[in-house]
């Protein structure tokens, strides 16, 4: 998994690509979000448009990132999950936990 961080006003957008799985993608997401929080960036959007697979470790890391951001006074929101990733998120009811957006501008404006 690869992560690229972009700045959009006071929001950091993390463009993720690849598989969010145990021992790979979950570590990339954890490290990227942790570094952003350490730098004081509390409003984070994870762009999932190029994530083609997520397993239980990836799901767990999404929840952990949201909790870490909330503890720092921020939030993590999701952008453009693929149909297969959205299906997994909805099966485990994370579509009720995360704000999920189809448009980047809406996600940015939600903060």
Where are each of the predicted segments found?
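Amphipathic alpha-helical interaction surfaces in cytosolic regulatory modules
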Residues: 20-98
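A short acidic, often aromatic-flanked loop/helix-cap motif at beta-alpha or helix-coil junctions
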Residues: 12, 106-109
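Short acidic-hydrophobic, aromatic-tinged amphipathic segments that line or gate anion-handling sites
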Residues: 99-103
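Short beta-strand/loop segment at the start of cytosolic alpha/beta domains
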Residues: 1-15, 35
């Amino acid at each position: 998994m690869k992560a690229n961080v972009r700045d959009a006003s006071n929001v950091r957008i993390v463009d993720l690509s690849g598989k969010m799985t145990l021992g790979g993608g979950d570590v990339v997401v954890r490290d990227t979000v942790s570094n952003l929080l350490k730098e004081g960036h509390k409003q984070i959007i994870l762009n999932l448009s190029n994530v083609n697979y997520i397993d239980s470790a990836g799901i767990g890391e999404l929840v952990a990132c949201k909790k870490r951001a909330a503890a720092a006074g921020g939030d993590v929101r999701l952008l453009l999950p693929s149909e297969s990733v959205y299906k997994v998120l909805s099966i485990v009811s994370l579509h009720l936990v995360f704000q999920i957006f189809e448009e980047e501008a809406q996600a940015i404006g939600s903060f």
